[in-house]
Amino acid sequence: WYQRQITDRKTPFTLKGGGTKMIPIARPRIVVEGGEVFYIFRDEERGSRVSMAHASDVGISKWTITDLTDFSVDAWEPSHDTELWKEQRKLHLFVQHTRQGDGERTAEIDPQMVYVLETDMNINK
């Protein structure tokens, strides 16, 4: 196991209180092949864009971060086509602009388009 800090977040947040919480960072999706790691996330500090951190060797490489969208996806949580990754090493992300209310409140939002973001695996090399 390796323990590495990927970003240097500054915004504090808490999960205290009742109900679900709108947090400023998504739970990441981590995709690995050998020692190479792709860390897909959304962070309010980066404009809530779809972002990807990459290390060619998790043990020694410096992380590079790239925003994969130039627009906010608000409360989006990463997900990818796991079988396409396993079979063809293609990283395709399911993306939809979403919102989440705080403390079991709903957030008003019109229906949003759903799309597949096909990443360029050489983007950070």
Predicted regions and their residues:
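Extracellular, repeat-based ectodomains that mediate carbohydrate processing or recognition
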Residues: 1-125
